[in-house]
Amino acid sequence: MDNRDYAWLPSLRPAGSDEKQACSECHFRGKAGSGPILPVDEWLEDAHSQSAVNPRFLTMHSGTDISGRRSPATRFRRTDSGLAALPPDPEEPYYGPGYRLDNPDHTGDCGACHVPAAAVNAPYNTDPYWVQGVEAEGIPSDFCHKIWDVRLDAATGLPFPEKAGVLSYEFRRPFKGHQFFAGPLDDIAPGEDTYSKLQKSSQFCAPCHFGVFWGTVVYDSYGEWLRSPYSAEGNGKTCQDCHMPGSGAELFARAEKGGLKRDPKTIVSHRMPGARDLDLLRNAVSLSLEAEPAPEGIRVRTKIVNDRTGHHVPTDSPLRHLILVVRAYGGGAGELSLKAGPVLPEWCGSGNPADGNYAGLPGKVFVKMLEEMWTGVSPTAAYWNPTRIVMDTRLEAYQTDSGEFLFTAPGSGDVRIEAVLLYRRAYKKLMELKGWNEPDIVMESAAVTLNFNFGVRHPN
């Protein structure tokens, strides 16, 4: 049974409140506290706790930049099959796309994943700008521990299309006078705390990490895992194995609140590192670089292996991409020109490379790029509209990508070849329009030195 009128418990006690049921009453140390880090402390560092107030999410939903300036409403033209959107008017100020620009009369189902505590009873009618209290906590602790089951398509093992987030979960919200928490510990005393094996299963993550819009699979980290060797029973890894490893703590509740010492292996971290975690990104793939003199110049080979990630890299949001930049210097000639090999596309940014503009430089991109069916805009961030996938060069689990570049050779002297693999959260132009300050992250780098006086190769 599920009580639709249940009031979610806050993860943190609101300031000035005498709330005694907040999760933080037992599971929070706080910066001024002593003792081990507890689950709510870790949850505060987790991006899930910020999903309702994430400025990228909010500005993409509203069609504004971070200063609140709004793009003009979308223009439409009539076709034989109905109305079709037009590209933005280049004569008008523009601050990037927005769901509400294209759909002014409804809020969509974005809240089903980003604001689930509010959307659970109104999945198609939750405006993220109007939520408050526990509903603005993103993915609250109480929400996760009320999930009892996930509805998946038996034929595919995936959530049903168009059933994101709360639309694919089954909840157990208690009625007045009772409480209920589902969790991963199987040795708790019988009562309102209940063991759920789902809490340690990747299926728990599926509804918010698989998204289909207009028949196009836009984000699919759960499906990518499901199709990879990581999903194999026995010797595979679950999402939780990587994103909720053991925290090393012996308590998950304060001792004075009844917390018992446990085997640290049974207590998992609630930080859930993801796309903003430097350690995770820098341990996702491997990069190697080789260079050798050739009759026609300097031949450079790169190899990137997705050897440590159980899904594609990058994954989920199609705005994310990796940029491999390969450059050669030396021999008194400054930067050496590329004679043959791939170069980076215009959307990597035109201008000074010191400012993150890499268009035209030797390199490769790893991206799932979408094109709007109506407007032809590509790359597009408005994936709520009908789109098609125009390229997908991301690295699958255990996949190797090899690149080859030929640079002009100097007459003599040392030549240094550098390769840098960057993680970029969104297309550069979009970030400029929205005012997002998201510096590139160096995931991997490598360098090699060639001495053209003796033809000696010195790896760095």
Stretches found by the model and what they are:
Residues 105, 109-115, 205-209:
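Extended, loop-rich substrate-binding clefts of extracytoplasmic carbohydrate-active enzymes
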Residues 94-99, 103:
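Flexible glycine-rich active-site/ligand-binding loops centered on an Asp-His dyad
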Residues 411-413:
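Surface-exposed, short loops/turns at beta-strand junctions within beta-sandwich domains
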Residues 1-11, 32-90, 97, 123-397, ...:
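Primarily the internal scaffold of c-type cytochrome electron-transfer domains
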Residues 16-21, 103, 107, 138-141, ...:
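Residues immediately within or flanking Cys/His clusters that coordinate Zn2+
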Residues 3-6, 11-26:
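Short, contiguous pre-domain boundary segments
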Residues 95, 112, 116-123:
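Conserved, well-structured interaction surfaces
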